[in-house]
Amino acid sequence: MAKDPGRVLIFDTTLRDGEQSPGASLNLEEKLAIAQQLARLGVDVIEAGFPFASQGDFSAVQRIAQQVGGDEGPIICGLARASRADIKACADAVAPAPRRRIHTFIATSDIHLEHKLRKSRAEVLAIVPEMVAYARSLVDDVEFSCEDAARSDPEFLYEVIEAAIAAGAGTINIPDTVGFTTPSEFGALIAGIDCHVPNMNEAILSVHGHNDLGLAVANFLEAVKSGARQFECTINGIGERAGNAALEELVMALYVRRRYFNPFFGRESDSPTPLTAVRTEEITKTSRLVSNLTGMVVQPNKAIVGSNAFAHESGIHQDGVLKNRLTYEIVDARTVGLTDNRISLGKLSGRSAVRARLEELGYDLTREDLDEAFARFKDLADRKRDITDRDLEAIVSEQVQQPEARFQLRLVQVSCGSSLRPTATVILAQEDGQEQTAAAVGTGPVDAVCRALNALAGEPNELIEFSVKSVTEGIDAMGEVTIRLRRDGQLFSGHSADTDVVVAAAQAFVNALNRLVAGCGRQSLHPQHDAVLADRRPGI
């Protein structure tokens, strides 16, 4: 049987696999903010990126290893294909972390071998121990993944896994790369590996799931029963295509149904010991931070973290909840940190009070960013009576989003009405501080603003998404705007919040433009879509 740490290990890949969501690219400061919050959440492993993909990814992994990795903190992990160049870059990036891991992988399904790698089973079986051993020579902790394991021949899979463990892999990860399996099939796959790999007792069995059929978390729960003990998830379930297994759903399923799952860990069913090390009260905070920084809006009916997750519309349900919340709620909202805090801050409040609350919300701002956030807070306090945590999060996320901005919005002014043609005037500042003004007309005020900004920026793009939602309730609520731009097949998102949605739209568009300028031309390398280096030879 596979190694059993006695509980479930949570491997968070929000910063690697989650960032592969279209338009969800993060800059270094954003990745660092999320990594710091993941550490507060209590995940066991943070997969911080794919160091070989670009200098930006390498720097982000290295910075997270320096500032988030610690003797008592999470393991900092980097992803690497089964090639020496990838593995060496990964080792260098995670080197500053006291607890570090290299996660290397190669595909094992026949469809991947034939059409992507163009390699035989024998060649893959030779590559695996060589590359795992090389990784093991650089770090003490190596994880090996069989990409597309769910569609691989089980007998070949057993051979590959046995070779990887013999070469030094301490964790074996089984990905359902395309979200193909059903829970019973996935459970049987994990049980088969646990039973038929002779040296499986020397490694922890891990799983990685995609949600193409909406079964990722269900598959994981079945894998728990079959011996898997590490689970690779993302916050809010973000990821390419239909996303990944949602961390918050898995953790809370194990929390709420602990009596059911305890026996699979050799415990009494009524054992109160948690099955994960996750601090559940940090879940909502983490979800909102990731949503704010990626621009990926959480659907209202999303389990655990959706805005409707604890809402009751039916009169019968409302009556039951008022009498006893357990009639229609299986989770106390406070367990996941969901509160409707209204902070007692106003025009006379000081910077220290605002800074303290922001730190509680997971934001560690520089002095300059705090100054800007505090100025925006004071401005909002003049226009809005009650300031909530959601308001603060909306205010400060822009400071984290844009540490270096080529364009800065100085002014936006619009005129529109039932008998007027929508017209916008904008002033945009360049990096050198030079200000330029442009005016444009459009089908509406937002269209006019975007046309004027494009005229000044001179950066070709296509606006493919514009959405606005209320941050909080009330007529004075801030409106949060998300904009996505496309250029050369790449998506760039920006968001902003303001009590004036036109101003929010203008700033969101500028934020997206800044991401576009920073992101275009950056090396793009998708670890799950790119084969092992074509010219790679054994030993090179």
From Swiss-Prot:
Annotated region described as Regulatory domain, given as residue ranges: 408-540
GO BP terms, alphabetized: L-leucine biosynthetic process
Top EC class, one word: transferase
Main location per the UniProt record: cytoplasm
UniProt organism field: Prochlorococcus marinus (strain MIT 9303)
SUPFAM superfamilies: 2-isopropylmalate synthase LeuA, allosteric (dimerisation) domain, Aldolase
Name assigned to this protein: 2-isopropylmalate synthase
Keyword set, alphabetical order: Amino-acid biosynthesis, Branched-chain amino acid biosynthesis, Cytoplasm, Leucine biosynthesis, Manganese, Metal-binding, Transferase
A molecular function GO annotation: 2-isopropylmalate synthase activity
Enzyme Commission number(s) from the entry: 2.3.3.13
Quaternary context: Homodimer.
GO CC, any one term: cytoplasm
Similarity-based family: Belongs to the alpha-IPM synthase/homocitrate synthase family. LeuA type 1 subfamily.
Compartments, as annotated in UniProt: Cytoplasm
Location of the Pyruvate carboxyltransferase domain: 8-271
Function, as annotated: Catalyzes the condensation of the acetyl group of acetyl-CoA with 3-methyl-2-oxobutanoate (2-ketoisovalerate) to form 3-carboxy-3-hydroxy-4-methylpentanoate (2-isopropylmalate).
